[in-house]
Amino acid sequence: MRANKGSAGLDDQSVTDFEANLGRNLYMLWNRMSSGSYFPPPVMRVEIQKKDGGTRPLGVPTVADRVAQTVVKMIVEPVVEPVFHENSYGYRPNRSAHHALTMARKRCWHRDWVIDLEIKGFFDNLDHQLVMRAVEHHIRAHWVLLYIKRWLEAPVMDGDKIVEKEEGKGSPHDCMDAGGRAMQEQLPRVE
């Protein structure tokens, strides 16, 4: 978290503030997670500038919630990483936008066209039941499933009000690239 310079969530607690009482904060988080009583606090919605001049919503969790998410990520990632498509670069270990650019550069010698695709509101409209079924296909630990479901359902604060979302639909969380796999299934010969 420190490396990617994450900002404070709704509670205004920075990484430095969290570290000031690290033992206490980690114990409280562990105690709540291990007892099943941890509920993610609301995610703070911020608008991020896009290069085309528009904006996109991004959900900023609290530092403590990011620590909790990291715990679950450490369990989930080794299980699902081998399943992800080789052309998926977003939010993956040892892969970055630079790797994607390198691959795009290599491929431009074989193709003279490119698809630039953005599905507006993709993560805002994901069906949570479908997401959970996909996760349950790979993950069996009930406590992990419990917290993933709670994160999917976490409220989103925009300013001083909770954003109403459709039952079972997404929110502006920073999510892994799901569109690449769908594209590969629909256009399997495109590299």
Please annotate each region the language model reported.
Residues 57-58, 62:
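Conserved phosphate-binding loops in nucleotide/dinucleotide-binding enzymes
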Residues 32-47, 51, 83-191:
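Conserved polymerase palm-domain catalytic core
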Residues 73, 77, 102-105:
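A broadly conserved amphipathic alpha-helix scaffold signal in soluble, globular proteins
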Residues 7, 17-40:
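Amphipathic alpha-helical blocks
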Residues 71-72, 131:
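PAPS/PAP-binding and catalytic site of the sulfotransferase fold
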Residues 63-71, 105:
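Duplex nucleic acid-engaging cores and interfaces of nucleic-acid transaction enzymes
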Residues 1-17, 74-90:
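Charged boundary/loop elements
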